[in-house]
Curated annotation (Swiss-Prot):
Leading EC class: oxidoreductase
Catalytic activity: shikimate + NADP(+) = 3-dehydroshikimate + NADPH + H(+)
Residues noted as binding NADP(+) in the record, renumbered to the chain: 83, 131-135, 217, 240
Enzyme Commission number: 1.1.1.25
Statement: the UniProt record of this protein carries the keyword Membrane: no
Source species: Acidiphilium cryptum (strain JF-5)
Active site: 71
This protein's name: Shikimate dehydrogenase (NADP(+))
């Protein structure tokens, strides 16, 4: 598509950023809706982040997604921060407005939307969240807001204890994760375990409650060992790519004025891009 002088511009800021599938995702939506706009990968080093964000706003960009390592630094450049970002402790979506920069975090809402797309009610029962990083924080607080009782479990207990204290959540030791499955309706892996090039997550799904939903936010590979084991036992498996797609919806709507749909065609397009 040839852009006009009125094209809307957005992008994803990271360092590095070449691995991001967000340009493929947003590009598909732009083409689908015939929008005069573009979504660009923007490799910006940490020392240049604040100055570059200010420059993008002055250049007329509508906004940007923010990924590693900038999610915490994005707080400092915002004039207004949504409660989702405040509770998650990180910003992943910037919207440039005439009155300043607005920051939000869509990881939690994207995770919940992906659960519901798989027929899982986030408030159906207690949820066990493995991990205590930024994604765990966003997902745990979103589940809590949706009505679930949330239990945290992390390899390094200090972060999980702090997060549990901040939001009134339950914390259990890492060694108790498999035994705890029987008491939960949902388990979520927010760690890097199971990601390509990392060790698999060791979790004994034989101890899972019948009908348990097993979610993994890892999307490379699309089918992690955890999800494969869940499917083999007849449990509900919720893959990470869907979360990536759903969390992108609010930003696209804010920047380009159209609320896009996450459907099978979009999933296949981004999945094909992931598999090269």
């Amino acid at each position: 598509m040839i852009l006009s002088g009125h094209a809307r511009l957005a992008g994803v800021i990271g360092y590095p950023v070449a691995h991001s599938r967000s340009p493929r995702l947003h590009g598909t939506w732009l083409e689908r809706h015939g929008i005069d706009g573009a979504y660009l990968p923007l490799a910006i080093a940490p020392d240049d982040f604040a100055a570059c964000v200010a420059a993008l706003a002055k250049m007329g960009f509508a906004g940007a997604n923010v990924t590693i390592p900038h999610k915490e630094a994005a707080f400092a450049v915002c004039d207004r921060v949504a409660d989702s970002a405040r509770r998650a402790g990180a910003v992943n979506t910037l919207v440039f407005t005439p009155t300043g920069i607005e920051g939000a975090n869509t990881d939690g809402s994207g995770f919940l939307a992906n659960l519901r797309a798989h027929g899982v009610n986030p408030a159906a029962g207690p949820a066990l969240v493995l991990g205590a990083g930024g994604a765990a924080r966003a997902i745990a607080t979103a589940l809590q807001d949706a009505g679930a009782v949330v239990t945290l479990c992390n390899r390094s207990p200090e972060r999980a204890v702090a997060l549990a204290r901040d939001f009134g959540l339950v914390h259990i030791p890492w060694e108790a994760r498999s035994a705890a499955l029987a008491d939960h309706a949902l388990v979520v892996n927010t760690t890097s375990l199971g990601m390509a090039g990392h060790n698999p997550l060791e979790l004994d799904l034989a101890r899972a409650a019948p009908g348990m939903a097993v979610a993994d936010i890892v999307y490379v590979p699309l089918e992690t060992p955890l999800l494969a084991a869940a499917r083999a036992r007849g449990l509900v498996a919720v893959e990470g790519l869907g979360m990536l797609l759903h969390q992108a919806v609010p930003g696209f709507a804010a920047w380009f004025g159209v609320t896009p749909v996450v459907d099978d065609a979009l999933y296949r397009a981004v999945a094909a891009d992931l598999m090269g």
